Amino acid sequence: KESPAKKFQRQHMDPDSSSSNSSNYCNLMMSRRNMTQGRCKPVNTFVHESLADVQAVCSQINVNCKNGQTNCYQSNSTMHITDCRQTGSSKYPNCAYKASQEQKHIIVACEGNPPVPVHFDASV
Protein backbone atom coordinates (compact mmCIF):
# COMPACT_ATOMS: atom_id res chain seq x y z
CA LYS A 1 0.00 0.00 0.00
CA GLU A 2 1.13 3.52 -0.79
CA SER A 3 2.48 5.32 2.30
CA PRO A 4 1.19 8.83 3.12
CA ALA A 5 4.65 10.23 2.30
CA LYS A 6 4.70 8.49 -1.10
CA LYS A 7 1.15 9.64 -1.80
CA PHE A 8 2.23 13.23 -1.09
CA GLN A 9 5.10 12.83 -3.57
CA ARG A 10 2.82 11.37 -6.23
CA GLN A 11 0.17 14.05 -5.83
CA HIS A 12 2.29 17.13 -5.24
CA MET A 13 5.94 16.78 -6.28
CA ASP A 14 7.15 17.70 -9.75
CA PRO A 15 10.73 18.92 -9.30
CA ASP A 16 11.73 18.31 -12.91
CA SER A 17 9.49 20.84 -14.60
CA SER A 18 8.98 24.53 -14.03
CA SER A 19 5.63 25.96 -13.01
CA SER A 20 3.16 26.14 -15.84
CA ASN A 21 0.18 28.20 -16.94
CA SER A 22 -0.75 25.56 -19.47
CA SER A 23 -3.99 23.66 -18.91
CA ASN A 24 -2.30 20.89 -20.89
CA TYR A 25 0.16 20.47 -18.04
CA CYS A 26 -2.65 19.99 -15.51
CA ASN A 27 -4.69 17.67 -17.70
CA LEU A 28 -1.65 15.50 -18.36
CA MET A 29 -0.26 15.49 -14.82
CA MET A 30 -3.59 14.93 -13.05
CA SER A 31 -4.16 11.90 -15.24
CA ARG A 32 -0.57 10.64 -15.07
CA ARG A 33 -0.51 10.87 -11.27
CA ASN A 34 -3.81 8.95 -10.92
CA MET A 35 -5.98 11.81 -9.67
CA THR A 36 -8.69 11.30 -12.28
CA GLN A 37 -9.51 7.68 -11.43
CA GLY A 38 -13.08 7.14 -10.26
CA ARG A 39 -13.58 10.90 -9.93
CA CYS A 40 -11.88 14.15 -10.83
CA LYS A 41 -9.87 15.56 -7.91
CA PRO A 42 -11.21 19.16 -7.94
CA VAL A 43 -8.05 21.03 -6.88
CA ASN A 44 -4.43 19.98 -6.68
CA THR A 45 -1.11 21.78 -6.30
CA PHE A 46 2.18 20.66 -7.82
CA VAL A 47 5.42 21.91 -6.28
CA HIS A 48 8.36 22.50 -8.61
CA GLU A 49 11.16 22.32 -6.07
CA SER A 50 13.47 19.53 -4.96
CA LEU A 51 12.10 16.87 -2.62
CA ALA A 52 14.80 17.81 -0.10
CA ASP A 53 13.65 21.45 -0.11
CA VAL A 54 10.01 20.45 0.41
CA GLN A 55 10.87 17.94 3.15
CA ALA A 56 12.88 20.69 4.89
CA VAL A 57 9.64 22.66 5.36
CA CYS A 58 8.81 20.18 8.16
CA SER A 59 11.42 21.95 10.31
CA GLN A 60 10.43 25.51 9.38
CA ILE A 61 7.48 27.62 10.64
CA ASN A 62 4.96 25.64 12.73
CA VAL A 63 1.38 26.76 11.97
CA ASN A 64 -2.10 25.40 12.55
CA CYS A 65 -3.59 23.31 9.75
CA LYS A 66 -6.96 24.25 8.25
CA ASN A 67 -8.57 21.38 10.19
CA GLY A 68 -7.15 22.66 13.49
CA GLN A 69 -4.34 20.12 13.81
CA THR A 70 -0.99 21.55 14.86
CA ASN A 71 1.40 19.53 12.67
CA CYS A 72 1.49 21.95 9.74
CA TYR A 73 4.56 23.87 8.64
CA GLN A 74 4.96 26.89 6.39
CA SER A 75 7.97 27.31 4.14
CA ASN A 76 10.42 30.11 4.99
CA SER A 77 10.71 31.06 1.33
CA THR A 78 8.34 31.09 -1.61
CA MET A 79 8.28 28.11 -3.95
CA HIS A 80 7.32 27.65 -7.58
CA ILE A 81 3.96 25.88 -7.72
CA THR A 82 1.22 25.15 -10.22
CA ASP A 83 -2.39 25.10 -9.02
CA CYS A 84 -4.67 22.84 -11.06
CA ARG A 85 -8.41 23.48 -10.75
CA GLN A 86 -11.13 21.48 -12.41
CA THR A 87 -13.06 23.58 -14.92
CA GLY A 88 -16.73 24.05 -14.06
CA SER A 89 -17.94 22.42 -17.25
CA SER A 90 -15.82 19.26 -17.09
CA LYS A 91 -17.25 16.02 -15.75
CA TYR A 92 -15.73 12.63 -14.98
CA PRO A 93 -14.32 10.73 -16.87
CA ASN A 94 -13.34 13.75 -19.00
CA CYS A 95 -11.64 15.71 -16.26
CA ALA A 96 -10.38 19.08 -17.49
CA TYR A 97 -8.25 21.53 -15.53
CA LYS A 98 -7.00 25.06 -15.71
CA ALA A 99 -3.54 25.89 -14.46
CA SER A 100 -2.27 28.87 -12.55
CA GLN A 101 1.38 29.43 -11.97
CA GLU A 102 2.28 30.90 -8.60
CA GLN A 103 5.21 31.68 -6.41
CA LYS A 104 3.98 31.27 -2.84
CA HIS A 105 4.83 29.88 0.56
CA ILE A 106 3.53 26.35 0.99
CA ILE A 107 1.94 24.84 4.09
CA VAL A 108 2.25 21.09 4.55
CA ALA A 109 1.31 18.65 7.30
CA CYS A 110 4.22 16.52 8.48
CA GLU A 111 4.37 13.14 10.24
CA GLY A 112 6.96 10.59 11.18
CA ASN A 113 10.48 10.54 12.53
CA PRO A 114 12.22 12.21 10.79
CA PRO A 115 9.11 14.22 9.82
CA VAL A 116 8.11 14.23 6.16
CA PRO A 117 5.21 15.94 4.34
CA VAL A 118 2.05 13.81 4.18
CA HIS A 119 -0.55 16.43 3.21
CA PHE A 120 -0.57 19.68 1.23
CA ASP A 121 -2.64 22.12 3.30
CA ALA A 122 -2.41 25.50 1.58
CA SER A 123 -0.29 28.07 -0.19
CA VAL A 124 -0.02 31.67 1.02
From Swiss-Prot:
Organism: Sus scrofa (Pig)
Tissue: Pancreas.
Chemical reaction(s) catalysed: an [RNA] containing cytidine + H2O = an [RNA]-3'-cytidine-3'-phosphate + a 5'-hydroxy-ribonucleotide-3'-[RNA]; an [RNA] containing uridine + H2O = an [RNA]-3'-uridine-3'-phosphate + a 5'-hydroxy-ribonucleotide-3'-[RNA]
Protein known as: Ribonuclease pancreatic
Primary role: Endonuclease that catalyzes the cleavage of RNA on the 3' side of pyrimidine nucleotides. Acts on single-stranded and double-stranded RNA.
PROSITE patterns named in the record: RNASE_PANCREATIC (PS00127)
Glycosylation site list: N21, N34, N76
Subunit structure, interactors included: Monomer. Interacts with and forms tight 1:1 complexes with RNH1. Dimerization of two such complexes may occur. Interaction with RNH1 inhibits this protein.
Disordered: annotated segments: 1-24
Compartmental location: Secreted
MF GO annotations: lyase activity; nucleic acid binding; ribonuclease A activity; RNA nuclease activity
Disulfide bonds: C26-C84, C40-C95, C58-C110, C65-C72
Any one GO BP annotation for this protein: defense response to Gram-positive bacterium
Domain of life where this protein originates: Eukaryota
UniProt-listed InterPro entries: RNaseA (IPR001427), RNaseA-like_dom_sf (IPR036816), RNaseA_AS (IPR023411), RNaseA_domain (IPR023412)
Family note: Belongs to the pancreatic ribonuclease family.
Keyword terms: Disulfide bond, Endonuclease, Glycoprotein, Hydrolase, Lyase, Nuclease, Secreted
EC number(s) reported in the record: 4.6.1.18
GO cellular component: extracellular region
Amino acids binding substrate: K7, R10, K41, P42, V43, N44, T45, K66, R85
SUPFAM superfamilies: RNase A-like (SSF54076)
